[in-house]
């Protein structure tokens, strides 16, 4: 399973990349807003420069989301985003207009990430439209007492049934168990916040074992 980081924070991206485990990056308008010091003066050109900076750090798919709702506007903005760098993937919502845009991008060889997916039918339509990736948001489903991981399992099964090449990116990951469950479900990718990436390596028995080993090592050095 591939690991993407779900952030627009350059320091977090650099830190994750240094681990040697990072395959790509996903961003969205909310993540961009978190890192903007002066939102009133943050322009679309600033946004493009920020995406370009991410592309310089990670040699892999970098998802950048359109901020319009009509297909023609999505296409215009998406083509502009795709021109930033060959690794840019255009994120489009799975709406009727978004599906039109995804189909257009597919025909032009521009990679897409169908986002805000909450049902198997949305994922099926995204694959039919030619999406490169589809992003089910499991944490947000869990928030409303719905089994988010069951959706991932359904999408994987549907894609396997018909041989769709659309890759499943498990998004809205809240904790390490989501990552493990995504791997067990056969998802292609998990896009993970930096905090959760750091949690993946932690275990209390590992910490206890290290403490004991260091204590014993200290004794050996003194003897």
Curated annotation (Swiss-Prot):
Source species, domain of life: Bacteria
Stored Gene3D superfamilies: Aldolase class I
EC number: 2.2.1.2
Positions of the catalytic residues: 91
CDD domains registered for this protein in UniProt: Transaldolase_FSA
Molecular function per GO: aldehyde-lyase activity; transaldolase activity
Cellular-component GO terms for this entry: cytoplasm
Name of one Pfam family that matches: TAL_FSA
Pathway(s) it belongs to: Carbohydrate degradation; pentose phosphate pathway; D-glyceraldehyde 3-phosphate and beta-D-fructose 6-phosphate from D-ribose 5-phosphate and D-xylulose 5-phosphate (non-oxidative stage): step 2/3
Keywords in alphabetical order: Cytoplasm, Pentose shunt, Schiff base, Transferase
PROSITE patterns, per the entry: TRANSALDOLASE_1
GO annotation (BP), single: pentose-phosphate shunt
Location of this chain's protein in the cell: Cytoplasm
Catalytic activity: D-sedoheptulose 7-phosphate + D-glyceraldehyde 3-phosphate = D-erythrose 4-phosphate + beta-D-fructose 6-phosphate
Function: Transaldolase is important for the balance of metabolites in the pentose-phosphate pathway.
HAMAP family documented for this protein: Transaldolase_3b
Similarity remark: Belongs to the transaldolase family. Type 3B subfamily.
The protein's name in its UniProt record: Probable transaldolase
Taxonomic path: Bacteria, Pseudomonadati, Chlorobiota, Chlorobiia, Chlorobiales
Gene this protein is translated from: tal
